[in-house]
Amino acid sequence: MRENTPPRTPMDELIGDEEDDGLIYVGDADEVLDAWEQEGNIDEENDDDDENLFNALRTGRRVVKDDAKLTFDMHKGAVFCGALHPTEDLAVTGGEDDKAFVWNIRTGEVQFAVTNHTDSVIAVGFSYDGVFVATGDIAGYIQVFKVAQNYRKVWEFTAGDMCWMRWHIGSHVLLAGSDSGEVYVWRIPSGDCKVLPGHDAKAEAAELTQDGKKLAVGYGSGHFKLWDLKTNTPIIEVDPSIGHAVNITSLAGDQENQMFITGAEDGSSCIMGSNGLMGMLSAPNSEPIEAVLMDYPGFEIKVAATGTLHGKLTIWDVARQTKRVECSDEEPTGITKLLWLKDFTICAGTLGGIIKGWDFRSGLMRFALDGHSDDIQDIIYDKERNIILSTSEDWTAKIFEVPASQ
């Protein structure tokens, strides 16, 4: 691993540049010693308690109940990313240990291991039809393997320090954003490439439109661009003097490919449209926005959601640009990612390791899934199987079944 460099994590915005002189604080010293003493009295066969105590001492949180259907624990470091195969019982995960694994979501058995990355694997994914699986590390080394041919490598490339990587939603095209601001677009497996030029700022976040023809990109400078992937030109461009003045951390689009919501690390969130900036949902404040969503399919009005690193989840009326609901949470924990689920449910991965779900119409919490002992880095939803794949700083990935709506 090159200098053991992880990607930007949500906690970066909260802790800044403070150092702790190498000390790891896991709570009151007496409590830790008591835990060690208690562990010494536990029968050696109680493996589950051993693992829970190890996680508690390492991360400061002991899991009381694990709601997961399956836990994958082959990684030897934080697990940063994951993806689910569109039809097969397969997941792929990547982590700080410079490795990626393809594994069976029913048994946990490893199907394929990618061990030749030299830095943290921060992006993985299956192509839209499951034919290919891609892995990419923070240094920009990307590999693509053909699933049905015993994971034969069909393509590789080094693009320079990478921020994100994702597959196109309807073709064998792979996209990646770089620290230098360029966005690479490759045909797989031929490797034919075109580049969407940058401008001295990270291509921090990106989202394809529903028709797959355009790519919205948020940059570290606060710039927002909507690129036409066929002509290689920006259709919309909003510069920092009008929109965000700082790093855009997340963005999402609507079903009609006409509007986007953006969130930034200064707490601001904007609505972008065909003519540029349409309005600001939230002005800069002390709560960095880490995740956004827009336009729940089939709902009566167009809504958007913003999740902050302080744990606030807000549902917005897009047309009126007003707050509709603030979701209730008696123990708020920083939100790292948001997903729409079935039955008018919005789901959040959190810094506390809990996966939470709310009815976004009322803001009432529907479920809280426990199992992770440290921050959740990624969550992925499979609508057909109604399951969630989660990845965490606790070195594990887990499969959860979504609880039935009450």
Residues covered by each model-derived region:
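WD40-repeat beta-propellers
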Residues: 100-103, 142-146, 183-187, 224-228, ...
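Canonical WD40 repeat/beta-propeller blade segments in eukaryotic WD-repeat proteins
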Residues: 77-83, 119-126, 160-167, 201-208, ...
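Hydrophobic beta-strand positions that form the internal "hydrophobic ladder"
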Residues: 91, 133, 174, 215, ...
